[in-house]
Amino acid sequence: WSNSEHNGRVVAAPVQGGSQNTRIYATVTEVEGTKTLGLASAEWYYHRNITDSKGVEYTVTETEMPQSKITITGDRNEDQTIDWQDGAIAFRDIMNNPYKYEEVPELVAWRIAMNFGGQAQNPFLTTLDNVKRVAMHTDGLGQSILLKGYGNEGHDSGHPDYADIGQRMGGAEDMNMLMEKGAEYGARFGIHVNASEMYPEAKAFSEEMVRRVNGNLSYGWNWIDQGIGIDGLYDLAMGMRESRFDELKELVGDNMDFIYVDVWGNLTSSNSEDSWETRKLSKMITDNGWRMTTEWGSGNEYDSTFQHWATDLTYGGYTSKGENSEVMRFLRNHQKDSWVGDYPSYGGVANSPLLGGYNMKDFEGWQGRNDYDAYIVNLYTHNLMTKFLQHYQVVDWEDGAPVQMT
């Protein structure tokens, strides 16, 4: 194991944002008919020199001191065979664990509460009523609510002013009441933020924050105002992003559980949004006591505990539904909602009836979904089983022969 933040040399992925973080290199050589395997840590960054989009250079200090660990093991799962599964079980003793990963098996009832376009469709105290409603129908099973549009005039307004909690939705007072009272019903709350794009109404918007590509603006999403690319390296090196998260922390204290970082990895804020930048972003979030979650199915493998495109099975392209590595799922099925779910019509690894995978639905406006009954039925049909199994670590994996039902 290594904590290298390097992107690796040959790894392919559909997006950046930490998806290419290669921490160990394996090299196979053959000499006089004898093959040998060597393992080595990838490069570490200590004091990294970076240049923002306007040509200004900075030196950014290390995220943490370089580390590598080795473990040697025997038949850990007692199946009379020593193979990669025994190595994976032993690897858990030395690997990194995403912050607050132990919460994941308890989060049975994920959903999005949506506010958009200044309409405050789901004020914070209405969301609290819905928390109580779901708690009654699930005997208090854990809930995880993503407040998409908590700030400014709602979703994709006012980025990246993280502390601009929307007044129409109830302001900081009602948001804290939602989180404090909701916790009594087993609910945890997080917010949707953006570290790549900003909007002209944001207080953080400035010429220094704008990313320039050959002198031109970098553009993002544009369904209300036109999103303008943030100069992510400037934002990082100058401590601007970190200070905005700190301002939010002053308002919400310890009430909030997680942060969802939208679109990170689509290269709006820099030419790379690489694993090092991603680890820096994650540390700003986890240092404030917030769990890290993100959008893309393969994004931020090191720190993220939830990938929206992996769990919202009918949203986004079917080829981008999450991590499909058998080894990764063996290691971390209990730590993440980041896997290709059980959705057989997609084919391939999406046919996963044993471990399942989170199947996200909503009833508070996201994607126009408003069917509460369907939400509850889906929890019991798909997600209760998935979450039950996440309480246990995988120790023995056997691929059976497929059966064709006739």
Outline where the language-model segments fall.
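Charged helix-capping and loop-helix junction motifs
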Residues: 274-280
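Glycan-recognition surfaces
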Residues: 200, 204-243, 290-406
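Short, contiguous acidic/charged loop-to-helix segments that flank catalytic cores in large enzymes
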Residues: 269-272
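Exposed, low-structure sequence patches enriched in small/polar residues
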Residues: 264-265, 282-284, 296
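Alpha-helix-loop-beta-strand connector modules within alpha/beta enzyme cores
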Residues: 178-182, 281-290
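Aromatic-lined carbohydrate-binding/catalytic grooves of carbohydrate-active enzymes
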Residues: 101-267
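Carbohydrate-recognition beta-sandwich/jelly-roll modules
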Residues: 1-144, 149, 167, 185-188
